């Protein structure tokens, strides 16, 4: 309960921004030394979402949806999704990929609203994993 006190005066938007910082740092750390999920280049990686975080908020913090991706693919090629998909299935397997797609289909039927407690859990989980 004491940990949550430091987040008491933060808005949901502020909590989401903090969660993004810690989650993306974890993804970059997890995929450090690996090639870009889309083009295979070895360069500085960003946290690239297969399903965009803006259009699909329910999988914004799903580790199967976010992988190390170079700036060129992530930003200039809008995710470079065709090779991303092929390499993603190879990396996580067809079963986990199908589960990710199912989550997307189910989420399309509902409006997603961020929960303060969920965001605090994300912040604390990835803060700990980044140590």
Language model features with spans:
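A boundary/linker detector
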Residues: 1-22, 43, 101-131
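Short Cys/His-rich Zn2+-coordinating modules
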Residues: 15-26, 50-56
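Short cysteine-rich loop/turn motifs with clustered Cys
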Residues: 20-46, 70
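Histidine-centered nuclease catalytic patch
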Residues: 37-66
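Short Cys/His-centered divalent metal-binding micro-motifs
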Residues: 44, 66-92
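Short cysteine/histidine-rich metal-coordination sites, predominantly Zn2+-binding motifs
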Residues: 51-58, 85-93
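Short, surface-exposed acidic
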Residues: 92-102
